[in-house]
């Protein structure tokens, strides 16, 4: 296998999947390091960029490499400074998924770094999306100007979350009933877009609030470097003097000391009526690695789930992407037949739709007459081969809760009323029947219960079903609803 040819093909496919802006921001400095019989290693200039790619893009990178060479079993990301001397120019490079901003009167200035040097210039493709105007020192990755409420596709699955987000951006501290706002959803369903839209709108509001937007990973990195540099107090003072904290990917917040500091910050902001917005890939009560005090405080506000987009939303996303592509190339055209087909076929998330569109846009340059059959062939990795998606415990909880007119939070709570206990036991039973999860893991997903509680619930529902035809029909109906949800 020609290594250079492999990397060129891989890079082209990766750019088609993630889009040119994302590629320029996160993968422009990715280099092929070594290729052995079963392991491919890439290098990046910083530890943080390695962590970012590992957490967000490793599955995609691995699948693309394996599609080029099926013998590859493993893909690794290394830091170049760990494998060879770092040149001076490289030591200034940083890739940090964060935007920190604070607004002075009519001048949107950014809160400067407390413990790090300024980052190197952003790639040209990324510069096009930076906030323009009278901004002060820029630190880390800027807010993406494309992520606004106007560009967010609204539908039945995200309407409540969007309404809450707009209320916070417009009302600020007046939106106390949404404090903290916790948005949870699977990968690619719009959490980051919505959080950045809140930050963008807040900065542009006449209230001139001081806003900090960051990821949980970046929060950990900033505190670690501040502690290392004996500058933690300065960082804490900076964060305490803000009006709006927006933090993404809360599921990645790790470490006892870091969580302790975050808990203090969260308590201080909420007690001072400062707005906090958090997003994660699961509900706050399912974040088992979080300190119970943090989890409890996050549960004290408004938790809203964003579900997968329906057909109308998917079609609108593709239409908007088409409009954006035509701004760059007025002659660009993909037939409505193909757009409709893709909207019906690629159903998992907006991110997969974006990948599908980028793939079609890339292919169109040398295959101008794409047919529906050819599109199916190109997007087979997104459309799937007819296999059902893995059932998630949170899907079971949501469907059971809806069926019995209770909330998911009640299912995982300590309440033991009859109206809650029966649905909870049925949900535990279905979790054991429909997922590969163990009794202890199911117990953790139901509010940290012991595995014996789950075992008791499973045995009890089995016994009841054998003598209660009505309950048996209810459970079969729930199974069908869950399987249809994952079809």
Swiss-Prot record:
Kindly list the positions annotated as binding ATP.
188, 190-192
Molecular-function GO terms, alphabetical: ATP binding; ATP hydrolysis activity; DNA replication origin binding; lipid binding
Q: Where is this region: Domain II?
A: 71-141
A biological process (GO) of this protein is: regulation of DNA replication
The places in or outside the cell where this protein is found are: Cytoplasm
Where are the residues of the annotated region Domain III, AAA+ region?
142-364
InterPro entries xrefs? AAA+_ATPase, Chromosome_initiator_DnaA, Chromosome_initiator_DnaA-like, Chromosome_initiator_DnaA_CS, DnaA_C, DnaA_dom, DnaA_N_dom, DnaA_N_sf
Keywords, A to Z, come to:
ATP-binding, Cytoplasm, DNA replication, DNA-binding, Lipid-binding, Nucleotide-binding
What is the protein name given in its UniProt record?
Answer: Chromosomal replication initiator protein DnaA
The species this protein belongs to is Agrobacterium fabrum (strain C58 / ATCC 33970)
What GO CC annotations are associated with the protein? cytoplasm; plasma membrane
Question: Partners and quaternary state?
Answer: Oligomerizes as a right-handed, spiral filament on DNA at oriC.
One Pfam family in the UniProt entry: Bac_DnaA
Region feature (Domain I, interacts with DnaA modulators): 1-71
| Record region (Domain IV, binds dsDNA) | 365-487
Q: What does the comment on domains in this protein's record state?
A: Domain I is involved in oligomerization and binding regulators, domain II is flexibile and of varying length in different bacteria, domain III forms the AAA+ region, while domain IV binds dsDNA.
